[in-house]
Structures are given as structure tokens and as C-alpha cells.
Amino acid sequence: MTLATLAIIALYAVFIQWVWGWQSVVSLWSSAGWGSAAVALVLLLGTYVLRTWRIYDYFPAETGGRFGTLLRLVQVHNLLNIMLPFRTGEASFPLLMKREFGLGVARSTAALLVMRLFDLHALLAAAGTGLALQTGKLWAWALWLAFLILPAIAFALRGPAFRFAAKILPNKAKKLLDEIKAGLPLDAKAFARAWGATLINWFTKIAVLAWVLGLLGDLSIAASFGGALGGELSSVLPVHAPAGVGTYPAGITAGAVAFGAGTAGLPLEELGQAAVNAHLLVIVSSLVGTALSLLVARPTHHRS
């Protein structure tokens, strides 16, 4: 799988050279300023730290005092998600949590499912900000706010939902139901922290990618946010190619076009180059984040 991923990345590099030329692609950053690239990279690295804190706060008894180890785990998991196709890297999370922290596979899997639902909602909410900003209408912000608070409503109704499920499920399934409960935030305060961290994380990431796309592709606010949404949706849905090669830039292009970007001639060519640069930025941030996490993580012994 690793060799196949490396081969696809190499072909992607050849494709970029053939279509645009690496000099043309990289020159966009030269025009925009390498300082902007550095700022974008630092902000993306910050989202990885926040993502780690969310899990650290989610499982305080198991992860307490070992933030560096958890940061390394999260970065390895994130890198596997990027490099492996069809979201197969997700399977590494419960296995890594079991190995490093002794956390049950069912519990960590349930928690991962809940966090991914948080992620998808926050991703859509963050992208919706671009539409609301572009529209500038009160009704647009009202719809956005209504969508934003949906997770809070769902969490408030979890009690009746679990009681109903306990009545209709067979006894063998009740153990799994208990594990799913354990995967949820413990209380309203824990939910608020997890939800808040998720919103900040994704609003930051989408805003950074939208800024980069607008800077490099000369896109409107709505098209920039649409492109960021399209790229990230392509990575969280099970259509993700190894390292996002092809699918991530295509998602950016489709999202930007859906939100009003030009579809022919120079605007489309500039959008394509900006999409490739945004994709490369995501890959580089993941590689740098993983390398840095290896430096800060202290070696730990396997828990029996």
C-alpha cells in the first residue's frame, strides 16, 4: 500500500509538471509571498494541536499527562488518513488508542464515530459561513445559525433515544449500546468543550484554505469557501484517493465552481493551480506535523 501511494504521488508530480509546470505552480506563492505560506502552515499545524486536545479532553483518565504521545498518535492517524485510499486509515485510530492507552476498541471506535459526525457538521457550518458572508442577508445568517446548533439539540435528546433503543434491542446488542454511550461526551460541559474545539478547528482550517484559494486563485469569498469545502469533503467521504491525489484538487475545483467560480479559460486554469497548491499545503502540513510530533512525544511502554 505504501509503495502504491508513493507511486501515485510520483505520477501526480509528473502530471503537475506536464499540465502547468512546477515553476508555474510554485510561482503563485512567490507572487503572494512566502510569508503567507508560512502563516497558513502554522495555522494548519495549530489545528492538529487542537484536534489532539479534543481527544485528550475526551479521555482524561486514559490520556492524562501524556499529551505528547497522543499528539504523535493523532498525527500518525491523520497521515494514514491522507495517504491511504477510501478512509481506510480510520481503522488505525482504535488500534493505536488500544496499544498506547489501553482504551477498548469499541469505545474508541464509538468516540471516533461521534467525533466524525461533529467534524462533518462543523465542516459544513464553516463552509456555510462563506455563503452567508457572500449573501449578506439576515435570513442566510438565521439558517446558518439554525444549522450550527443542531448538535446541541441532538445531544439534549440522547436520553430518550437511548432508552427507546434499550427497549427494542436484543440483550446481545445492549453491550454495544453501552459502548456507544461511553463514546459520547460524559456531560453537557464535556460536550460543549468537544463541540467548541471541533468548531474552532474546522472554522480555522476552512478559513485558512479559503484564504489560500482566494489569494492564489483570485476567487470570491463564496467560491473560496466552496473550494475549501469541496476539497475537505473529498477527503472525509469514502471516495478519497491515496494522498488525495486527483480527488482533493478536483473537490476544490468542483466546490469553487458550484459557489460561483469561473468555468473556462484563464480563471479555470488559475483555479486549478490554486487547488494543487492548497492540496500540497495540506500534505506538507501533515508531514511537518507528524515529524514535529515525533520530536515532542516521549517514548512510552506498552500497557498490559
Q: PLM ranges: what are they?
A:
Residues L113-L133:
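Hydrophobic alpha-helical transmembrane segments of ABC transporter permease domains
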Residues M1-V76, A132-L237, G262-S304:
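Predominantly cytoplasmic-facing regulatory/coupling regions of multi-pass membrane proteins
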Residues T88-E100, H240-A258:
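Re-entrant/interfacial helical elements at transmembrane boundaries that shape
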Residues L71-G102:
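Extended non-transmembrane interhelical loops and adjacent amphipathic helices
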Residues S92, T109-L112, A228, A275:
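Membrane-interface helix-entry/capping residues at the boundaries of transmembrane alpha-helices
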Residues H77-P85, L229-P249:
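Transmembrane alpha-helix interface/packing and boundary motifs in multi-pass membrane proteins
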Residues L50, T88, H121-A125, V284:
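Residue positions within transmembrane alpha-helices of multi-pass solute transporters
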Residues R99-L120:
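Membrane-interface helix-loop-helix junctions at boundaries between adjacent transmembrane segments
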